[in-house]
Amino acid sequence: MHLENDNHRFMNIMKTERDLQGEGGGGTLGNLSTSTTSVDIDRLDQFKGSNDFILVEENNRSSTTQAIKSWAKRKVNSACTRKMLHRRVPILNWLPKYDSSCAVGDLVAGITVGLTVIPQALAYSNIAGLPAQYGLYSSFLGCFVYIIFGSCKDVPMGPTAIAALLTYQAVNSKGPAHAILLCFLTGILQVLMGFFGLGFLIDFVSGPVSSGFTSAVALIIITSQIKDVLGISASGATFVDTWRSLFKDIHNTRTWDTVFGVACIAVLLIMRLITKVKVGPSDTDTPPSKFHTVVNKFFWLIGTSRNAILVVVCGFIGYSFCANGEPPFRVIGYVPPGLPTVQPPPFSHTTNNNGTVESEDLLDMMADLSSGIIVIPLIGLLEDIAICKAFANGKAVDATQELIAVGLSNIANSFVQGFPGAGSLSRSAVNNSSGVRTPLGGLYTGILVILALLFFTPYFYYIPKSTLAAIIIAAVIFMVEVKVVKPMWRTKKSDLIPGVATFIACLVLPLEYGILIGIGINLMFILYHAARPKISVEKLTSHEGVEYLMLTPDRCLIFPSVDYVRNLVTKHSIRQGIPVVIDCSHIYGADYTAATVIEILTQDFAARDQPLFFYNLKPSVSSVFEGLSPKEFVVYYNHEDIDELLRNKSCIKKQILNV
């Protein structure tokens, strides 16, 4: 609040004082009751008001350019501190404290996650519509980068089912070049969002919208893998299109693929249950014996490594059939051996379409990727933050740092021909239960993937496609969040609306439109909530027996809500015909529209000769209202002052009474 406005306010107080006391009055409001604190206007520094009142003296206003320079200087200075360096490069915090116990925990967890990510990477590349090797290419370099910049020890960077499906819909059969460029652009956008502190954007994705989106994605992924379980060819951009394509080709179902796929799903679900088997005393107070501990660890290891075990066993079966001739089921086929070539992502692309050479530059490729460039970074962040919160154990999650870490990991992956990735919730659970201590566990995961690329790719040829489809289906079926419906129904039924709308929209429309619809519905709920504040109405009586109406809004006055509040105030004031007090204790902000409506409201009350007072109005809000100089605008801060105000309502023009 500027000095000019305060001087104007003191002049009004002086004028009001003379009206109350006459020309011979002194420097105080002598007519007021003893419970009201006096106001000395002789000296500015003796002004005493509400405890919330802050007077700021500012003789020289900085120009816009100077303000920007000052802001930039503060940002640069804060970015160049040791604290900021440790915040943006978290490895500097935990590496000096690293010891042998951490090394053992990270080694066990890293190898366990590596055994999980290799079959998943092969399967997720199928979801993305890419050859199998691209899933492995996406699974090692990002792990190394996340070790340096990642802030959560449980996050294993790599391909995920959701990112793979979004990549498939964005690339739309354009080929690996577009997927690699998408990975690079995703990383660039995530780093920029982190630099500008835009991690808060995920706050607009509520729990119901996230649950609806995740459940729809799970069903779409399951549907996309049914074709490999049945051994048929089917495709589709949406859930409905895929099912239509499946029914069209259902008569070509291959028996061996179907039997093999269904059997693999059953085995995986059974092996998943093995992790929950506990041998030993059921009494929690009795510690298990060493034998029981070893057996439980063995069961846990078998259940956790189920994907790798199944791939090895089915690979041997596939090899046996191939050695004796053509296998009765479809296999992955040739996977190029060795590490990928380290090179920049493709910024142009040339294709040979039936003898016609077609060239695309960067802008053409970006146009092909369309909204995927925006959606995939946000969804990747949403996945990553969900993991960080799940395993944070009450610690704060730095969304900005996670944006930077995941973005740099995706940029690195694009240089080794990877497609977009993020933190995987299933692998994070494995990582956490394996006893990971620091992000260095990703080192062993990445090394295991590199070893697989160097030495085991010839054996991937024999893995049945139905086995990989079974791995995906058995994993994502638990992503369908049916369990959240009942709690939503019990707590707030209206939350089901954005959740169900997102779920249906994602199934019928492309995923990016589905989640935008969900967010849009959420924002409508928020805006409606802001536009319809709750107002309590009380009919009270002052100490002197004068009745008045107390109206208490429960939130800020901003443009969507002010007309609604004005109509309610007018309605109740006309109906009762007594003085009105608006309790502003919960009003922490206002805008120009609110000031305009308050001005009209005071004019209406003055025209009806009906007193209107504002109680406990924050000085910052009061200055907004006073900007339009409303008529008979009276603010007070002490309950006892209402008697004096009601007694002197006929002669008060504008004043502020302070505690």
Region spans (language model):
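Transmembrane helical cores of multi-pass ion-transport proteins
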Residues: H2-K534
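Cytosolic C-terminal regulatory domains/tails of membrane transporters and channels
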Residues: M1-L85, V89, P533-V659
